[in-house]
Swiss-Prot record:
InterPro entries: WecF (IPR009993). Its main location: membrane. One of its GO terms (molecular function) is 4-acetamido-4,6-dideoxy-D-galactose transferase activity. GO terms for biological process: enterobacterial common antigen biosynthetic process; fucosylation. This is TDP-N-acetylfucosamine:lipid II N-acetylfucosaminyltransferase. It comes from Pectobacterium carotovorum subsp. carotovorum (strain PC1). The keyword DNA repair does not apply. The keyword Transmembrane does not apply. It is a peripheral membrane protein. Its EC number is 2.4.1.325. It is an enzyme of class 2 (transferase). It comes from the Bacteria.
Length: 361
């Protein structure tokens, strides 16, 4: 009998908790236990099994310990299969490259960042080369439409399927009409976290150039931890450009309901990372009728256009009239049909897990 183990190979609490909650609360209610139950998770602080009673979770204190556990299982039982949720664990890539883990044992759901190559040092260039070679040996790849297109340029022979991250969304909010006030300054959300990939300072300068100082800017930087120096730089630039009255930097992570309430107040999002990132925040903005600016280098634009959603590209001319027109277009879309919204992404997960178990879909 095939055993399927889900692997969260890096200690990224906010994403890992979302996946575990989705499997425990949603998939466990409708799919066979053997498809959803077994998890190995990298977590220095541990995970309470009482929070996820439908799952059997083995925690490892770090990436290396987790990789060793996965490799040992893979070598002991070649019928065992592993579903990698994201993959930021170099030891696992090397194990796949060396044959310690076989291609047919690995199913990989891409989380965006693990496809892209941003660092330029010699050490990273060597790692990226090895990772590219390993990524060609995956048995089956799941990703967004844009990430699949990017991946297939380098690994055209690997089977692929469309699959979306299980964004935490309340479907009851999808059909709600959110009226945007036309009077007063626009409110612009910059970035989805404190990660430098958001290029916050560049975004702030671009917003100031396009709209002037009379817009309200919100910058959420509640994670990652130990980011005080960069936060201070962004805060200094933001205050200099927009002043205390119009610039708000959020240094603590908001509770989910508070985050939703904050998003509802926005007129525009500004996300100029050069990769697929922040789909959760983008989904919530779409749900509330808020258009956003993205980079042309972010392949998620392909998913947006496939769903007939307006796309505003970074670097193009932009003013308030164009923002209001994008809001109008977004309001006219039947959001219940959007493929990457809850519950529409559920069928992709049903098919993916059946495939990983070798069952018909």
């Amino acid at each position: 009998m095939t055993t399927l183990i889900h692997v969260l190979g890096s200690d990224i609490p906010h994403h890992n908790q979302t996946v575990l909650r989705f499997f425990n609360d949603v998939l466990a209610t409708e799919l066979p236990e053997q498809q959803i139950r077994h998890f190995i998770v990298a977590s220095r602080d541990g995970i309470s099994s009482a929070d996820f009673p439908a799952l059997r979770i083995e925690t490892c204190v770090d990436k290396k310990t987790l990789a060793e556990a996965v490799i040992a299982r893979a070598k002991a039982n070649r019928n065992m299969r592993f579903f990698l949720h994201g993959q930021f664990n170099p030891t696992l890539w090397l194990a796949l490259l060396s044959g310690k883990i076989k291609s047919e044992q690995v199913y990989w759901h891409v989380w965006g960042a693990d496809l892209y190559e941003e660092a330029s040092s010699l050490k990273y260039r060597l790692f990226y080369w090895l990772r590219r070679m390993a990524q060609k040996r995956v048995g089956h790849v799941f990703a967004t439409r844009g990430d699949l297109a990017w991946y297939q340029q380098r690994a055209p022979r690997v089977p692929t399927s469309l699959l979306y991250f299980p964004t935490r969304m309340n479907p009851a909010l999808t059909g709600m009409q959110v009226d945007k006030p036309l009077a007063g300054p626009m409110t612009i959300l910059v970035g989805n976290s404190g990660d430098r990939t958001n290029r916050h300072q560049e975004a702030l300068r671009a917003i100031h150039k396009q709209f002037g100082k009379n817009v309200r800017v919100i910058v959420p930087m509640g994670y990652p931890a130990n980011n005080e120096s960069y936060i201070a730089q962004v805060e200094g630039d933001g205050l200099a450009l927009f002043g205390v009255k119009n610039f708000q930097l959020l240094k603590d992570q908001l509770a989910f309901d508070d985050y939703l309430n904050m998003l509802r107040t926005c007129d525009l999002g500004y996300f100029i990372f050069d990769r697929q990132q922040g789909i959760g925040t983008l989904c919530l903005l779409i749900q509330f009728g808020v258009p956003f600016v993205i980079s042309r280098q972010n392949p998620f634009w392909q998913d947006l256009t496939e769903q007939n959603l307006p796309v505003l590209f970074y670097g193009d001319e932009l003013d308030e009239a164009l923002v209001r027109e994008a809001q109008r277009q977004l309001a006219s879309v039947d959001k219940h049909q959007i493929a990457f919204f809850n519950p529409n992404y559920l069928q992709g997960w049903r098919d993916a897990l059946a495939l990983a178990m070798g069952e018909p879909t």
